[in-house]
Amino acid sequence: MKHLYFLAICLLSTFSSQAKQVNPELTALAQQYFNTMVATQAPNATNKELEAFLALLTDDVANQHLPYQTDDSREPDGKAMMRKGMTFYLGAHTEYQANLLDTFIFNDSAIALRYTHHAKGIHPQNQQEIEYTQTIMDVLEIEDGNIAVIRKYHE
């Protein structure tokens, strides 16, 4: 009976420790994504910050930002399109703050980050003042260690 009890304890502790193990590479990628994404939104952001963020992405990355961008198709020039779009808004904020609330790692294929952010600035297209505070969930699909799909959801 002692041996069965001991075996049961060993099995439970093994399963418990395996359930708690999280892919350290994806954990690091999640933090790097958040840090570089936040850096691109800073008032003093430059192409250096933008390129550090883009370096995490596949060349054919898909970017879906609901409800504004509903297409999540991966295109051969996905990264180039993101570079163009993000360059247009680069430096538009006069204030930007973000706070990471939760990070979720799903096996080796996905990351979800939930965060709040507050931004203030001038919209570069219409020169109107903007200010907003939101809670966002970014869901990232991972392929060969890079981010292949970004989906942004607003709370």
Task: State where each predicted segment sits.
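Short beta-strand edge/turn micro-motifs at domain boundaries
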Residues: 110, 133-155
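A solvent-exposed, acidic/Ser-Thr-rich amphipathic alpha-helical stretch
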Residues: 24, 54-107
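Bacterial N-terminal signal peptides
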Residues: 5-14
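Hydrophobic pocket/interface hotspot
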Residues: 53, 61, 82, 113, ...
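A short hydrophobic beta-strand element
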Residues: 107-119
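Short, surface-exposed coil-to-beta transition loops
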Residues: 96-99, 131-137
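Short, low-complexity N-terminal intrinsically disordered segments enriched in polar/charged residues
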Residues: 17-56
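Short, cysteine-centered beta-strand-loop-beta hairpins and adjacent loop/turn segments enriched
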Residues: 91-95, 119-131
